[in-house]
Amino acid sequence: MALQDKLKQIGQAFAGITNNCYHYWRAKKDLPCIVWAESAEDTSFNSDNKKSEQRIVGTVDLFTRTEFDPLADQVQGVLNTLGVTWVLNSVQFEEDTNLIHYEWEWGVTFDGEVEEQP
């Protein structure tokens, strides 16, 4: 699967649990909201002088004003459904915005072979 196709799958899955789902940034007015982003390539493998397996890592953040927001469980459900590795990295109350902020780190490994472009 191509990199962009896999990333689109991730975004579509999160958009399935809330209309307030953003890639890289968040609208200040829409809460609760999810922001997800890929951040880097992690340990990957090359063979025959080309990428044979690629691991991409990223984050998904939930911003809410609701204590014990059920959307947090839905995010974890999506991560499990996607078949990615993940960890709940932090949960914090942001005093400057009065928001509860959950952050998960995720990683996905897939065939990194890229089709040659004409």
What positions do the PLM features span?
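Long, contiguous binding/interaction regions
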Residues: M1-V57, F63-P118
